[in-house]
Amino acid sequence: MNFHEYQAKQLFAEYGIPVPAGRIASSADEAVTAAKSLGNGPWMVKAQIHAGGRGKAGGVKFCKTTDEVKQAAATMLGTKMATYQSAGVALPVNLVLVTEAGEITKELYLSVLVDRGTRSITYIASSEGGVDIEHVAAETPEKIQTLNVDFVEGLQPYQGRDIGFHLGLEAKQVNQLSKIMISLYQLFNDKDLSLIELNPLAILSNGDLYALDGKINSDDNATFRHKELAAMRDKTQEDETEVLASENDLNYVTMDGNIGCMVNGAGLAMATMDVIKLNGGEPANFLDVGGGATKERVTTAFKLILSSNKVKAIFVNIFGGIVRCDMIAEGIIAAVKEVGVKVPVIVRLEGTNVDAGKQLLATSGLAIIPADDINDGAKKAVAAVTA
């Protein structure tokens, strides 16, 4: 799950990580009130969307007067904003964050993430903040410090200080960085997060470190343990189809192609998309109905796939292990009838009760195209959309 910047900063503050004072606003007048409550300025007005790169898209403004605050907020609120990190999707700006604008002397980068390669929580730090870390890694990799944390020992203060020394910080700042890193480690573990990013972690004119911008992602599989995080979810920032899928315990990701996919099992779903690509087609989605698929879930899955008018064919690829092929076949038949599917449906069944499942499809009276295997199914799906 993704979070807004203001939500990330709320969590940072709870764990003692220094952040500038700020308030959110949903109107230009509220933004002015927020600015006045923060002092005499200057201020930053920042659009709240689930994407980075807001500055280049006009979503971050430096304001010296309350009139400028009002104008900046009015320009952002109620619009949709696309950035180079939003994958071409324009996200609605429903809130702005108004914060104090401190004088920055240096921008750093600091993040915490799960490194699957080393099977550890890993810190990435750089003396080059305020820019994409990917660019720094490609152009000046020597400016990046990494630290893999031992799960048993946890992060130790000396490790944070070592990172600070390598970043060229002064003694006071080294100690501040160490404390921030320990707080981030606690936050990361307490809330089951998958990413924390401070970019920039800035040194202000008084020599202190502040998290001027923050990004966090949490592990969706652990959300049930954190009702306080679930309450922060902003569904307006998410794809409507993906929201509906999550509410029905379906794993769904929208893609750009025209061949809808319904598969049981994430691995088989990815393999299905690969085979479609190998045969010259483009998948319209990733959809894993899971091992506990029911008629109702299959019907919902069809509705999800067909919610996109780009879909010109549907490839159903089921391996019956836990789930029975005859039950899936009944679900497909019921769904096609209920939803009124108008596009070709290609079905490949294999596994438990496969013969019974194929018989049900063959005698259903529906124009369902059978497939012998995954490659045959992919070829027939591609042929259906190119016919």
Swiss-Prot record:
UniProt keyword Metal-binding, yes or no: yes
Residue ranges of domain ATP-grasp in the record: 9-244
UniProt-annotated binding residues for substrate: N264, G321, I322, V323
InterPro entries: ATP-grasp, ATP-grasp_succ-CoA_synth-type, ATP_grasp_subdomain_1, Succ-CoA_synthase_bsu_CS, SUCC_ACL_C, Succ_CoA_ligase-like_bsu, Succinyl-CoA_synth-like
Any matching Pfam family: Ligase_CoA
Annotated family: Belongs to the succinate/malate CoA ligase beta subunit family.
PANTHER family: SUCCINATE--COA LIGASE [GDP-FORMING] SUBUNIT BETA, MITOCHONDRIAL, SUCCINYL-COA SYNTHETASE BETA CHAIN
The protein's name in its UniProt record: Succinate--CoA ligase [ADP-forming] subunit beta
Species the sequence originates in: Xylella fastidiosa (strain M12)
